[in-house]
Regions:
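Active-site neighborhood of glycoside hydrolase catalytic domains
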Residues: 98-156, 676, 704-771
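Substrate-binding cleft of carbohydrate-active enzyme catalytic domains
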Residues: 31, 35-47, 65-112, 119, ...
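Aromatic- and acidic-residue-enriched carbohydrate-binding clefts of CAZyme catalytic domains
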Residues: 8-16, 49-76, 80, 100, ...
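Carbohydrate-interacting/catalytic domains
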Residues: 1-50, 74, 79, 131-133, ...
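Acidic, His- and aromatic-enriched active-site or binding-groove loops in soluble protein domains
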Residues: 73, 100, 142-149, 167-177, ...
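Hydrophobic faces of well-ordered beta-strands that scaffold small-molecule active sites
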Residues: 13-17, 43-45, 87-89, 117, ...
Length: 1003
């Protein structure tokens, strides 16, 4: 929460006065009463209004001395305060006064009762001058507000104004086309400066608003509610009070007053090709139809899937009743938070299933149920809000008609929800469900012989062929009698209708659709069959599939070379990391480091007295896995860091490394947990070809008996629970493939049953089967072979493998471009261009990607002939100059910005590779399942040379002829252009080795 929010928790609801009424009495009190009645809490005087009553006041736009006495702002402010209103001046800075002169000017305004000022030209003074000016004025009145008119400001200008002391900024809503994603980008930049207020109109917005136009009410209602949802306050022009939307103005202000200020990002949830535009902030959203001619169909499932809020559901009163919007119409909605799903113990009776003999076997077959992992042995992974399609092959003997349904529930619920399946042909049935709670779910499929529909279809064929169906009709009457006996108590209304039909014997009515519907309602299901077991689903929060990781060593964050960094010093880096677009801040182990066999620089076996050692040699006299290294600070310092990261919109990921130094307290407390050699020494850890003399590993099973060491398993689980209690919700797990799979399945199950929102990243650079198995047992994400996939064929085949359904159901990639252990050969000799190439590949191909600090500075110095960093930070402190030349910070920031505004890039799925007539150029598209977001990416894999490559654009996949025209947007520059024809030559250079184009329209 910024300073504006802290001091003024209520939202800014400002009325922009176009002219102060004259005479002041009774005009001004009447205006104040009217503003109060419409729930405003502030009045903005028009530009040029005199701010002082005393003679000789210096204000060039005062409007004449004869008005000074009549328009005394002190009197106006005093009258306004009676109605709970504060008065602001709209100031256009003249060049005749210095910063100190304007300081005196503002102080005099405050002394005359003004609550604050709207500054139109902040560039008149340097940010430091503004900071001093604001501080001086607040020395007179602490709650003085300085609002900054920001429409038209560049990102660089806004960045300079951070910390200058302003309380409010203004979003460029009146200039927005109600489609482009730049509105959310601008909001993020403004919010970093001060709380965001949204003007409903602006004189220079190019709009001629006429309150008498027939569509004015709809237009202004749309604008008012968009402004209210998008910001922490609104600026409303005075003329609206006397228009047909005055009641809507009051409703908006009252809604804002109830909501109060919130510190939440603004997001545009749809792609450029969607029929409508969805703006969402906090728990509220608005759907706009910007088209002036066509209706917009609303896909509430799609909106649900894009919500940035985990475990929440859209208000059913809206989603169940509004399925389209007329041209230029809008629809508001809200979301309701739902509790996470926490498991309860399953009884032995529920687990026990008894098989049936062959003679009693199900007559109906249910096969090839999808999605599933190893026939339900492990949970399918999905993300809350995403629509999950469930399919199966369902059939029985003969040509009988069948029915089928999916039954599903959350693991902490007892009642099942049922969704009827649709027959797609060739015995394939399908249904879709949407999971909106974080946690474990389960589903199964039921199928039955639809006796009535089978009978009805056969008789209709006979009747239409002119055959005698009298006996058949009598058979139908008997079947209806059976149904009546079944349904008499449950469906009395339907029972009465069927009894009348039986009595009449009317064949046409008996075969009618209405009778078939009545029989379906009764549930007249013969040979009902259930699939063999329930299939588990794990619905995780969005960060499990879409996240951006930044790794740093807290001990290297000191501003003094050679001094050990602290958690407090890490906080200084948070703004810069968030500015680059990262949302997960990952720390290697932060625990005490052992002394025995401590490693020296560059993994030397001999450490000097000042060498800091490897953080993976965990444990000393200062504690073990539940302690922090004393030179980093205290546990309370760490909690404060967690709080600060949350304030910056970041999450901390901790390294969970099951590794101990010989000094770890566990060796004395639990010596039986470790592998002691006959000579009394310990066997140190190995991960061939690497050896870790400073680390020993606990043993998960007891010698000879091969029984789990339950006390060790519980202790490791409790370590994770301890850090969860501190506020950590993401863990990167070191080398999980060197620990038993049963342990991981047990421990991850224990954690997720209590805290289903916790995310685990597997750092297992090993064989594919083991990496995939770790995903199956519960890891949310995994490092991948991307680090070593460099050429076109390697990248194409690997992405196609990861995107197959059988892999995607349990394995999610996180593309790290480097790690403290891995300095890829490609980066060692590719220069700045190579870093741009790898960043672009990771950011566009994977929903989650990460980098280890120093990558943005193009660090590549390596140990000769090895894929390791020279002077590795694993063994020493590394202070860096973050502003050094040749960095790629702007490009990384740009890539992350594009990712967040392009839904097609939110996952590794939906990728298709297209012909590029150059083996060094990778060309691909990504699209959402709904095709509302389509992006084309070209990346040159050669970091040393410029290349011109012919690219074949996938017009055929969009149903377009080869000569068609596609309207595009360059996501990096914002430039829009038309692409005519499906083959084009594109140039790539080492300075600009990639492009990202978003499809805006197809012709």
């Amino acid at each position: 929460m910024n300073e504006f929010d802290k001091r003024f928790g209520d939202c800014g609801r400002l009325l922009a006065i176009d002219k102060v009424p004259q005479p002041v009495e009774p005009g001004w009190p009447e205006l104040c009463r009217e503003a109060f009645d419409h729930a405003f809490n502030g009045l903005l005087l028009p530009p040029g209004f005199p701010m002082f009553a005393e003679e000789g006041a210096v204000y060039e736009l005062a409007g004449g001395d004869e008005l000074v006495g009549l328009l005394n702002p002190a009197l106006l402010a005093a009258e306004a305060s009676k109605y709970g209103l504060q008065v602001y001046a709209d100031v256009e800075l003249s060049e005749s006064l210095s910063a100190s002169g304007w300081t005196d000017f503002f102080i005099r305004g405050v002394n005359n009762g003004l609550a604050g000022f709207l500054i139109r030209e902040p560039g008149r003074f340097a940010p430091a001058d503004w900071a001093r000016l604001v501080a001086s004025v607040r020395g007179v009145r602490t709650d003085t507000r300085f609002l900054l008119w920001t429409p038209g400001s560049t990102p660089a200008q806004l960045m300079e104004l951070r910390g200058a002391g302003f309380d409010g900024t203004f979003l460029s809503l009146p200039w927005w086309d109600e489609r482009s994603p730049w509105l959310a980008d601008e909001y993020a930049r403004l919010d970093a400066v001060a709380s965001v207020i949204v003007p409903v109109d602006a004189n220079d917005a190019g709009e001629m608003l006429d309150a008498n136009l027939p569509d004015f009410e709809q237009y202004m209602g749309r604008r008012l509610w968009t402004a209210a949802i998008a910001g922490n306050g609104v600026l409303v022009p005075q003329f609206v009070l006397h228009s047909r939307v005055s009641d809507e103005v009051k409703a908006v202000n009252q809604w804002l007053a109830r909501r109060r200020s919130i510190k939440q990002p603004l997001v545009v949830l749809n792609g450029l090709l969607g029929p409508g535009t969805v703006v969402f902030r906090g728990g509220d959203g608005i759907v706009l139809n910007p088209d002036r001619l066509r209706e917009a169909t609303l896909d509430w499932r799609l909106v649900q899937s894009r919500l940035p809020t985990d475990s929440a559901v859209i208000d059913q009163a809206v989603s169940d009743n509004v399925d389209s919007l007329l041209p230029q119409a809008y629809c508001r909605f809200s979301v309701k938070a739902l509790p996470f799903i926490k498991l309860k113990a399953i009884s032995t009776a529920e687990k026990r299933r008894l098989g049936l003999g062959v003679m009693n076997a199900a007559r109906i077959a249910i096969e090839a149920v999808r999605p599933q992992v190893e026939d339900g042995r492990f949970a399918v992974k999905t993300v809350v809000g995403t629509t999950l399609e469930i399919t199966a092959n369902i059939f029985m003997d003969g040509h009988e008609r069948l029915g089928a349904s999916v039954l599903w529930r959350a693991a902490d619920e007892s009642d099942w929800r049922e969704v009827l399946m649709t027959h797609e042909g060739n015995d394939r049935w399908s249904a879709s469900i949407t999971l909106v709670r974080v946690g474990r779910h389960q589903f199964h499929i039921k199928a039955w012989h639809d006796r009535w529909e089978s009978y009805r279809a056969a008789v209709i064929k006979k009747r239409d062929a002119g055959m005698d169906v009298a006996v058949d009709i009598e058979e139908g009457r008997l079947m209806l009698g059976d149904a009546v006996r079944i349904a008499r108590r449950i469906h009395p209304g339907i029972t009465s209708m069927l009894e009348g039909l039986i009595e009449s014997g009317d064949g046409d009515l008996l075969l009618a659709d209405s009778t078939a519907q009545a029989m379906r309602t009764i549930g007249f299901r013969a040979f009902e069959t259930r699939c063999q077991h329930d299939y588990p689903i794990m619905a995780e929060r969005r960060a499990a599939v879409f996240s951006t990781w930044y790794e740093l060593f807290p001990r290297s964050e000191s501003s003094v070379p050679g001094r050990h960094g602290t958690f407090v010093e890490v906080r200084r880096r948070l703004a810069a990391i968030k500015e680059m677009g990262f949302d997960v801040l990952y720390f290697p182990p932060i625990h005490p480091i052992g002394r025995t066999n401590r490693k020296g620089r560059n993994n030397s076996l001999t450490a000097g007295k000042d060498d800091v050692g490897s953080p993976y040699a965990i444990g000393s006299e200062d504690g073990g896995h539940d302690a922090v290294h004393p030179q980093l600070g205290t546990l309370d310092d760490f909690r404060q860091l967690l709080h600060a990261t949350k304030e910056h919109g970041l999450e901390v990921a901790l390294d969970f490394a099951i590794q101990c130094s010989p000094d770890h307290p566990w060796l004395k407390q639990h010596p039986n947990w470790f592998n002691w050699r006959p000579d009394g020494t310990l066997r140190y850890a190995e991960n061939p070809p690497k050896r870790y003399e400073d680390i020993v590993n606990p043993e998960f099973y007891q010698d000879f008996e091969l029984k789990p060491r339950a006390s060790l398993w519980r202790a490791l689980r409790d370590v994770v629970l301890f850090w969860i209690e501190q506020g950590v919700r993401i863990f990167r797990v070191d080398n999980p493939h060197t620990k038993p799979l049963p342990f991981w399945e047990w421990m991850l199950g224990e954690i997720h049953s209590r805290h289903p929102d916790v995310i685990f990243l597997s750092e297992a650079f090993t064989r594919p089967a083991m990496m995939y198995r770790l995903g199956k047992v519960g890891f949310s994400q995994s490092y991948t072979y991307f680090t070593w996939r460099n050429n076109k064929a390697e990248l194409t085949s690997y992405l196609e493998e990861l995107a197959t359904a059988q892999v995607a159901n349990f394995f999610r990639p996180n593309f790290f471009v480097n790690t403290p252990d891995i300095n890829p050969y490609f980066l060692q000799n590719s220069g700045r261009s190579g870093f741009l190439i790898r960043a672009a590949l990771a950011a566009t191909l994977s929903g989650s990607w990460g980098m280890y600090s120093g990558f943005e500075l193009c660090e590549a110095a390596a140990l000769p002939g090895r894929e390791e960093y020279l002077d590795s930070e694993k063994y020493e402190l590394r202070q860096r100059n973050w502003s050094q030349s040749a960095n790629i910070i702007p490009e990384i920031t740009q890539l992350n910005r594009v990712r967040k505004s392009t839904p097609a890039l939110w996952t590794h799925m939906g990728v298709r590779f297209h012909p590029a007539h150059d083996d060094h150029v990778l060309f691909f598209s990504k699209s959402t399942p709904q095709k509302d977001s389509v992006v084309l990416v070209g990346i040159c894999l050669d970091p040393h040379a410029s290349r011109r490559a012919w690219l074949d654009f996938p017009f055929w996949s969009w149903g377009l002829p080869d000569h068609a025209t596609v309207h595009m947007e360059d996501a990096l520059s914002g430039r829009e252009f038309d692409l005519q024809g499906n083959s084009h030559q594109v140039e790539f250079t080492p300075e600009s080795p990639y492009f990202i184009w978003r499809v805006r329209g197809l012709e």
